[in-house]
Amino acid sequence: MQFSTFQKNLDNWQGASLIFGVLEEEIASQLENIKFIVDPKLLLKKVTQKKFKGEKGETLSFEFLDQKLETLIIVGLGKSKYLNKSDIENSIGNLIRKTVDKNEKISILLPWELINSQLEINQLAESARLSAYKDNRFNKKKDEKKVLKEIEFLNFKSFENICFEEAEKICEGVELARRLVAAPPNSLTPQEMSMQASQIAKDHGLEVKILEAKECEDLGMGAYLAVAKGSDLDPKFIHLTLKSEGPIKEKIAIVGKGLTFDSGGYNLKVGASQIEMMKYDMGGSAAVLGAAKALGAIKPKGLEIHFIVAACENMINGSAVHPGDVVKASNGKTIEINNTDAEGRLTLADALTYASDLKPDSIIDLATLTGAIVVALGNDVAGFWSNNDDLANDLKAASAQAGEELWRMPLQKAYKEGLKSHIADMKNTGPRAGGSITAALFLEEFFDTEIKWAHIDIAGTCWTDKNKGINPSGATGFGVKTLVQWIKNK
């Protein structure tokens, strides 16, 4: 799918479907903006008859028989003083999703004076494309409906030289993350994930290293391998490196939890634990690889970025880890496994140690780590923890720009008491209360504390059961846009 603009004489324009955004106030004057299609006075009469007021989310459609336009969809944006970028994106996204099966091209005309920067234009374009996303890979009968190929923006004023190339690259990263998360576990195995990473490296000139189980064993990754040994599928430890040409001003490591399926192990997931959905337990690694794809194409200056995923399954066989086992992570710390369904933090323990040994300036990890964060923040907001206020503020700002909401959670040191073990250095889970916090405190034990670090728990945000905003039902690709924006802001 591509983006385009039409900025010439609109009298010469024609199209199939036009989405036209209007504010709640002064509708009559705004209708003058589409006089190249229809008589504004006639349209105002019809709009008035339909009692359309331009309230947020309100829509009105008209069908035309002439050659200039087939369908006009007017969408209300509400009052200008209350309008924000997210409202515009969600309104346009909902409409695109409703019309995507009917058109190969959709045109959009908005009150551009409310868009404050080229960045916001690009983000609007991203939202439009991501709203139209469809995944029909596993359907027996291929979708015979039309496929949206182009989104066109009409009549820019302040953004005549707008370029959408970067927006397209970011969308490709989000779409990759969505495909990875949505793929069934018999399709997206650790092997397949490593192949996806290798393809990113090939396409965008990244360095790639895939560590096999023996190499991980040689590095002392006892926590990661304890999880992996319950599966008949070999684990794959993925390390991609994107290094800018010229002087490097900052080194960054981005780590993603990569459980391609999580049965819970011997603490088997039952009932409301949704074992059938545990294909998305690699949402963190999907975000990391999606960001790698986007940033590999964008090629930021002055940075060395490491993308790390410890991919494996958490399954049950004769070799699977038992509740009560003690394992040793690669930093030498011993862990009593009191719950085999808290496996993600075990894989991250060795992945974070590996990242720390690279001596980066900062480490970000993303993981579908706890159900507790979903209870705390729901499905629209991801919780994050950080040992550095500057990093936390930068991530929060980037997430706001990207339209992915983060909420900072406390690293409540007193809660570490709940991780104490009588036979090992620590347990892998604490008490039920504050479960997402103790999970973050556990991770904090596996990297050099001089390194700036943030942990983002996306358990509630990586999937949606229904259409919501710019996300069709299914995988959201949450985290890609925030990571890319954070890097771009440097």
UniProtKB/Swiss-Prot annotation:
GO terms for molecular function: manganese ion binding; metalloaminopeptidase activity. The gene is pepA. CDD domains: Peptidase_M17. This is Probable cytosol aminopeptidase. The active site is at K269, R345. It is found in: Cytoplasm. The lineage of its organism: Bacteria, Bacillati, Cyanobacteriota, Cyanophyceae, Synechococcales. Binds 2 manganese ions per subunit. Presumably involved in the processing and regular turnover of intracellular proteins. Catalyzes the removal of unsubstituted N-terminal amino acids from various peptides. Belongs to the peptidase M17 family. The keyword Metal-binding applies. It comes from Prochlorococcus marinus (strain MIT 9312).
